[in-house]
Amino acid sequence: MLRSLFVDFNSYFASVEQQIKPHLRGKPVGVLPVMARGTCCIAASYEAKAYGIKTGTSVMDAKRLCPEIVFVEAQHAIYVEFHQRAVAAVERIAPVRQVLSIDEMECELTGSWRNRDKAMAIAHDIKREILSTVGSCLRCSIGIAPNTMLAKLASDMQKPDGLVVIEQAELPERLHPLKLQDVQGIGKRMLQRLQVAGIFSMAELCAAPRGVLHSVWGGVAGTEMHDMLRGQWYGPRNTTARSLGHSHVLPPELRNTEGALGVLMRLTQKAAMRLRKQGFYATAMSISVRCDHRYQATPGGGRDAQFGQMQDTGFFLDVLHKLWHSGLQEL
């Protein structure tokens, strides 16, 4: 049964830049956190990706790969504005159940919408609405599946401007060609734990008994993973949160000052989106960085900040830069 429709905008930051600056359309574009020679791309247009440029590619390497690339400095307030317009466009077609980040959102399919043909028609309507009311440069890939995790996987299977449906009857075999790291929640450490358990491929993950995955994940998350790979639906848990945040393990090419700051900016945006979506306000913000087996905690040294009730992404980004330049970037 199809229950989730996942919308993932393609090369979002770069696409917004091409939308507001027509002279960039059709050209390779790299989005930088700051206009500096020693920084790296936090986003790249599909024209740039064709040359091998991606998130984390340094300015120097990008120039070497594509001498005609155009660099622009990130404009986060504008990205937030376009995000709000995109959410409104999707909501005119189907109710948005949750916004997961600045370029991802999910709609829950109900009633007749769970029919494959109807779900695909809704997806096409969403694409048309975005192109006509948000911008012709804003393309998205849509995944449709029995649950959120599978719908997100489906949205990654065909880019750009893709539409992929995974049906219950196709599971779990449809997932076998994927990599383990394609599954949300399987990072470097979880991959190592899976390998210790003798699981090296997606086919082996899908074949693993529920008890094995319960042990690997160390709890109910493993049981849920087993079930979700087979199409089981898990709705959001009713919990009361006092804080929310995001973390990310930097790939080797981003393990530098500019790369870390660029990722922190993305994480801040994602957290701010969730904050507003859940109707909360923040009165404090903290950041922490783990460096080469050392951990720099947030208390002291200007790594946290208190303020009045806030929801604004721009405000949080200003706080982030103040915390970063207070000395955290020197770790």
PLM regions: where:
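Gly/Gly-Pro- and Ser/Thr-rich, intrinsically disordered tail segments characteristic of DNA damage-repair
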Residues: 1-233, 273
